[in-house]
Every structure is written in structure tokens, then in C-alpha cells.
Amino acid sequence: MASNEVLVLRGTLEGHNGWVTSLATSAGQPNLLLSASRDKTLISWKLTGDDQKFGVPVRSFKGHSHIVQDCTLTADGAYALSASWDKTLRLWDVATGETYQRFVGHKSDVMSVDIDKKASMIISGSRDKTIKVWTIKGQCLATLLGHNDWVSQVRVVPNEKADDDSVTIISAGNDKMVKAWNLNQFQIEADFIGHNSNINTLTASPDGTLIASAGKDGEIMLWNLAAKKAMYTLSAQDEVFSLAFSPNRYWLAAATATGIKVFSLDPQYLVDDLRPEFAGYSKAAEPHAVSLAWSADGQTLFAGYTDNVIRVWQVMTAN
């Protein structure tokens, strides 16, 4: 891992009329980026890598009647899922932008969505304090109770073991708790206790061994999933809105209220602190990133901002 690597701002993607709340990429379609926004839409982008325009919008996904808070893609990039404050989820055909399925059952804003690698189970987390498990056809298989405040994020833990069919998911909430659940039995596996404030975001490492979680107090906690215990804490020094593990380096990116911090985890150091220039804003009112996604090859970091713009960084070797 070269310690002289830095991230360079390569371009922007503009098309949303509200905060860019979520971003998704897929290994199956490396030139596809999906974004979700407070403008109630999602946009699929074709990534060109051009210096003038890093990508172009392909289509807008319309149907939600309120803010779209989260989105994800199936591994092959053929289908998209979205979670909205209109209390529903949607499954979309990426090629056409048509809604394939609606998921109705949550009693409040749906904050988060994810899907397992076999595309057989969809999970959602809501301000109604529940996590729901769905089939791809929209049937609710289970409602998981355990959080006693808003569920802010849910994620499927990557499982690379070919002979292991178990599905573990993780969740975080405003109750300051991180939880792990076994989806084969729909049971809670572990509580991870240590945060002192609302948790906005959590994510699992690509090999499924680590969880990172963070929120209002700026403390990023790293957890060992198998041992069910805390490992160490990184200080982001500002509220954290999104976390993303690099797919091919021991890096963790954190979108904070003042910039995007990219941490190396082994050895531990700050790789970069991404703070683009914002013309025409006072320091206090500067936009900040609220969503992150790495490209599947780990060379590009996408960030969605509160000025409705997606900014694109590429990993470069510093001379």
C-alpha cells in the first residue's frame, strides 16, 4: 500500500435539484453510478472519465413522492433499490427506469435499504424503529424489533465464503446502538454498545470482518464482527454522515460536516482530507458531503453534497 497516494478532484456530476443523499456502484457495471436525492428522484450516470465531464446522466427514476434517502444496486447492476420518506421502497429496472416493485408496510420514513448478494432478500430500516425483510416480489418476510429509536442505516455484511449461505445484517440507530442480526433465523446476534450519540451511518468491510459506525459526535468506532467487540476509535472531529471502506486498500472514507477524511487503517494515519473550494459561500454555510461510494476497482471516490453536486476524486500517486 503506497503511503504516497493522494486523492485528486477529477470532476463533478450535476443533475439533481436537492441534496445527493446516497450513491451506489456495482462491480457488474463499472461505468454505472446511481444517485438518490432529496429532489425525490434517482439518476443513473454513465461514467466516461472525460476531463470536462466525468459522466453524463442517462435517466431519471421518478415515482417517489418524498425525499429518497438511500439507494443500492444489485451486484450485476441490472436493478436498483431505493428507500424514501414516502414510507415505501422501490425496485427499479436500471435499463428502463421503470418501477418493477413497490414495498409497502413501514409506518414512517424509510431511511435505508440493502440487498443480499443472491438478490433474494431485501432489508430496510425506518423511522418507525423497525427493520423489515422482504422478498424481491414485495412480500414482507419478517419485521425485526430491537431498536428503540429511528433506524438510520441497515447493511448486508459481505460473505465471500462459497459454502456458507448465512446472511448477516447490521443496523444502527438514534438509540446509539449497532446491532447484528442473523437473517436465516431472523434473530439478533449481537449488540455493539459504545456510541454516546445518534449513529448516522455504518458499513461493513469488503471481507465482512469489520464494522465501522459513526454519527453526531464524530467518533468512528471500528468493531470486530466475529468477536462481537469494539476494536478502536478514529476521531473525525465533526459529525459523520457517511462511511465507505475502500474495496482494495485498508482505507475508510468518512464524509463529515467539514470535509471528507480518508483514513488508512493499517498502518493508521490520515491519507487525505478532501475540502474542495466553494465559491460564493461563507465558511459556515459551505456545502458538505452526505454520501459516499467507491468504484468497484477502488480508484475513484464519489461524494454527494448538500449543494446538489456529486464530486469525483481519483486515487493518484504523489510525486
Curated annotation (Swiss-Prot):
It comes from the Eukaryota. GO terms for biological process: cytoplasmic translation; G protein-coupled receptor signaling pathway; maintenance of translational fidelity; mRNA destabilization; negative regulation of gene expression; negative regulation of glucose mediated signaling pathway; negative regulation of translation; negative regulation of translational frameshifting. InterPro entries: G-protein_beta_WD-40_rep, RACK1-like, WD40/YVTN_repeat-like_dom_sf, WD40_repeat_CS, WD40_repeat_dom_sf, WD40_rpt. Pfam families: WD40. The keyword Glycosyltransferase does not apply. The modification N-acetylalanine is found at residue 2. It is found in: Cytoplasm. Disruption phenotype: Defective activation of the ribosome quality control (RQC) pathway. Keywords: Acetylation, Cytoplasm, Isopeptide bond, Phosphoprotein, Repeat, Ribonucleoprotein, Ribosomal protein, Ubl conjugation, WD repeat. GO terms for molecular function: G-protein alpha-subunit binding; GDP-dissociation inhibitor activity; protein kinase C binding; ribosome binding; translation regulator activity. There is a cross-link at residues 46, 53, 107, 137, 161 (Glycyl lysine isopeptide (Lys-Gly) (interchain with G-Cter in ubiquitin)). WD repeats lie at residues 15-55, 63-102, 105-145, 147-191, 194-233, 235-275, 284-319. The modification Phosphothreonine is found at residues 96, 168. GO terms for cellular component: cytoplasm; cytosol; cytosolic small ribosomal subunit; nucleus. Present with 333112 molecules/cell in log phase SD medium. Component of the small ribosomal subunit (SSU). Mature yeast ribosomes consist of a small (40S) and a large (60S) subunit. The 40S small subunit contains 1 molecule of ribosomal RNA (18S rRNA) and 33 different proteins (encoded by 57 genes). The large 60S subunit contains 3 rRNA molecules (25S, 5.8S and 5S rRNA) and 46 different proteins (encoded by 81 genes). RACK1 is located at the head of the SSU in the vicinity of the mRNA exit channel. RACK1 interacts with the mRNA-binding protein SCP16. RACK1 also exists simultaneously as a homodimer in a cytosolic non-ribosome-bound form. Belongs to the WD repeat G protein beta family. Ribosomal protein RACK1 subfamily. Component of the ribosome, a large ribonucleoprotein complex responsible for the synthesis of proteins in the cell. The small ribosomal subunit (SSU) binds messenger RNAs (mRNAs) and translates the encoded message by selecting cognate aminoacyl-transfer RNA (tRNA) molecules. The large subunit (LSU) contains the ribosomal catalytic site termed the peptidyl transferase center (PTC), which catalyzes the formation of peptide bonds, thereby polymerizing the amino acids delivered by tRNAs into a polypeptide chain. This is Small ribosomal subunit protein RACK1. It comes from Saccharomyces cerevisiae (strain ATCC 204508 / S288c) (Baker's yeast).
